[in-house]
A protein has these predicted regions:
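Conserved structural position at the C-terminal beta-strand
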Residues: 236-238
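Predominantly extracellular/luminal regions of secreted and cell-surface proteins
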Residues: 39-88
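Short, isolated positions in well-ordered beta-strands
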Residues: 42-44, 56, 92, 112, ...
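Edge beta-strands of extracellular beta-sandwich domains
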Residues: 2-7, 241-253
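Proteolytic cleavage junctions
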Residues: 1-2, 6-37, 49-50, 69-70, ...
């Protein structure tokens, strides 16, 4: 798992990791098509290779996990932090339409790879609650050294799937790139006291796209990347519920919002027996 930890200089912050096992394992012959986790499909090239370049044909053990962007814990589970480097060299934040982790091995567990010059066909299922999907979506793979997504081509909408040709396997992500700005703020209660260690989530104003998740630092502060020129919603997570704190306007440049008041009156409750 690769995650990027963001925080203010000199502050202490927290990071939550949500780890998933491979949910599906299947056997696919080289040159054939098989199913992946959550209904995706994989078509292998006629030949694969071992680490040393030796050719392999035959039965391939395929393990996969699908990261559904519509699920609540998507950002915690996804590698990186949705920060990406486009083919033009610019930095983006990503709106995901689906993500796969795939590993290939032989029956003994030895890793297998796509040979140079070959590709595999990876087909992503469509998230059920997405009302529309672009005909073409940029394709991204995870660079484990930097923790950023790297643009590597285009996936296309085909027969109810989003289809891509991939030349290697790690994490693959289909996303629309958005220009990012950094928004900083400090969450405080009615007395002005810092809300330290509070889980937050920054989303689009309609809550359909999650931009960032994390925890406030010891001073109740945090900074997050959001999509430029789009309004956003600031939320905290309380008792596993997403609670809207404030809506913020669209910004075209990095912005410090200062203190954001969180009305804690309805959140705290005490239980017990008076004696």
């Amino acid at each position: 798992m690769v995650k990027l930890l963001s925080g203010l200089e000199g502050s202490q912050t927290s990071l939550k990791l949500q780890l998933y096992p491979f949910d599906a394992e299947t056997t696919i012959q080289t040159g054939a098509t098989g199913t992946l986790d959550d209904g995706g499909e994989l078509t292998l090239p006629a030949q694969l290779t071992y680490d040393d370049g030796t050719a392999y044909t035959g039965a391939v053990r395929v393990q996969s996990h699908y990261y559904n962007p519509a699920e609540q814990g998507f950002l915690e589970a996804a590698p990186g932090n949705m920060s990406a480097i486009g083919a033009d060299g610019n930095i983006y934040t990503l709106e995901s339409y689906g993500m796969y982790a795939v590993e290939l091995s032989d029956a003994s567990g030895n890793a297998l790879h796509i040979p140079d010059g070959a590709t595999a066909k990876l087909r992503f299922p469509l998230p059920a609650n997405y009302s529309s999907v672009p005909q073409e979506i940029p394709l991204w793979s995870m660079d484990e050294a930097s923790g950023k997504w790297i643009e590597e081509g285009v996936a296309t909408l085909q027969d109810g799937f989003v289809e891509a040709e991939v030349a290697h396997f790690s994490w693959w992500n289909i996303d629309v790139p958005l220009n990012p700005v950094t928004v900083c703020m400090r969450l405080v209660d009615a007395t002005g006291a810092a809300l330290s260690g509070f889980p937050y989530k920054i989303s689009s104003s309609d809550q359909s796209i999650a931009y960032a998740v994390g925890w406030t630092d010891a001073d109740g502060a945090f900074c997050a990347q959001v999509a430029a020129t789009f309004p956003s919603a600031i939320n905290i997570v309380w008792n596993d519920e997403l609670i809207l704190v404030a809506n913020i306007d669209a910004f075209s440049e990095d912005t410090d919002l200062g203190d954001i008041l969180v009305d804690m009156g309805g959140f705290y409750s005490l239980t017990g027996k008076a004696v």
